[in-house]
């Protein structure tokens, strides 16, 4: 067995022992016959301790489930973002967040830093700059979970529009 499967086996063995003990305690709590010893009667404090332990166990499992779900969703989003960047020919941003998703009250992440402009996008001297159509992919657009929202078309993001030539010879 691998190390991970050994650890999982140990977890299930411990869980089995815990559930066996819970079953024993439950049987003590609700004796089958009236002939049970007088010491088997539980006090309210003991019952509350058992209830609290079982509740903590359930809460801990729910917390672990949420952590795993958030990590899985973050991994899927990261994979999709990387694929979008690769397919569009845009280099990945230099800073890749390793801290996990940023939580904000508005539910929208800040847009990534735009990659530095390449030398081919700088206009030549004497030619007025051309207003470039904005086609940046933002994190909020990628993180939008609404299936019916407008999709970002990443085809042609790397292409530069043809430069308009000015004719100064007309008089």
Swiss-Prot record:
Coiled coil: none annotated. Keywords: Chromatin regulator, DNA-binding, Nucleus, Phosphoprotein. Residues 119-129 have a biased composition (Low complexity). SUPFAM superfamilies: Homeodomain-like. GO terms for biological process: chromatin organization. Its main location: nucleus. The keyword DNA-binding applies. GO terms for molecular function: DNA binding. Residues 38-83 form the SANT domain. One of its GO terms (cellular component) is NURF complex. InterPro entries: Homeodomain-like_sf, SANT/Myb. Residues 86-171 are annotated as: Disordered. It comes from the Eukaryota. It is found in: Nucleus. The modification Phosphoserine is found at residue 96. Component of chromatin complexes such as the MLL1/MLL and NURF complexes. Component of some MLL1/MLL complex, at least composed of the core components KMT2A/MLL1, ASH2L, HCFC1/HCF1, WDR5 and RBBP5, as well as the facultative components BACC1, CHD8, E2F6, HSP70, INO80C, KANSL1, LAS1L, MAX, MCRS1, MGA, MYST1/MOF, PELP1, PHF20, PRP31, RING2, RUVB1/TIP49A, RUVB2/TIP49B, SENP3, TAF1, TAF4, TAF6, TAF7, TAF9 and TEX10. Component of the nucleosome-remodeling factor (NURF) complex. This is BPTF-associated chromatin complex component 1.
